[in-house]
Amino acid sequence: VTSRNKGEGATMRVELITNSQQAVRKERVQEWEERAERITENAPPRIQRILDVASEKGSSVWLTALSLKEQGFNLNKREFRDAVKLRYDWPIDDIPSICVCGDTFTVDHAMICKRGGFVIMRHNELRDLEAELLNIVCSEVQVEPVLQDISGEQLNGGSNRAPDARLDIRGRGFWESQRSAFFDVRVCHPNADSYKGLGQVYKIHENEKKRLYARRVLEIEQGTFTPLVFTTTGGMGKECVRYHSRLAELVAIKKGEDYATTMSWIRARTSFVLLRSALTCLRGSRLFSQPI
C-alpha cells in the first residue's frame, strides 16, 4: 500500500509540474501575442501590411520546410536572400530601376508586370500542381475543361456566357461522390494600394470568380465551383483553405498517412511554387530574345 501511495504521489507531482510548465508557456505566448499586436497597431500602414502578410498561415512554410532537393524545397544563396527581403519588404538594390514596359521597376511592379510571361507562368504552375494533387484522389481530372454551351438557361448578369469558356481544373468525386467539381486559380499581389486589408483582397477575387462561373457551373454542369485565390506572398483565401483541408483529408486517407503530415506537405508544395514564381518575377528577363 505504501509503495502504491508513493507511486501515486510521484505521478501527481509530475502532473503538477507539467501543468505548471504548460500554464507558464501559455502565459508567455499570450504576452508575446499581445505585445506583437500593440506593435502592429502602432506601426505605419505599410509596415502593418507587411506584418499581416508575413504572419498569414502558409506564408512562412518555405522557411521551416526541410531543404529536400527531390521535392523542390531547396533554394540557392541568392534565392534565399531575395526570399527573406521579399518577406520583410527589405530593399533590393541590384534590380533595374526601369522595367522594359516603361514603368518604374519596383518589387510590387515585378509581381504584376505581364511582360515576359511570368504572371501567366505563375498561374499555370499553380494550376498544374493542383491538378496533380487532385489526380491522387479524383477521377477524370482535366486541365482547362471547356464548359457546356448555354441553351436557354437563366444566368445572373455577370456570368461568363462565352461559348468556349474554360475553367482551370475539373475533377470528379472531390466534394461529393461522382459529382464534378470545378476549380479556377487566381494569384493576386496583396500590396496593391487599392486594397485595405487581406480579408478584402480575398473576398474581392473570390466573389468575382463566383460571379463569372458559379451559376453556370451549378445550373448547366450540375457541378460545384470553388475559386482558388492565392497571394504572391503565399497566403490563401477562405475557399482555398477549405479546399486544401479537404484535399489533405482525402490524400491522407488514400495514402494511409496522418492528416497533419499530409497538410504540411501540400502547404510546402504550394508555398515553394509561389515563392519560386515570385523570385522569377523579380529576377527573370522580360526582354524577348531576337531570332538568330
Task: State where each predicted segment sits.
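Short glycine-enriched, charge-decorated loop/helix-capping segments at active-site entrances
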Residues: 116, 197-201
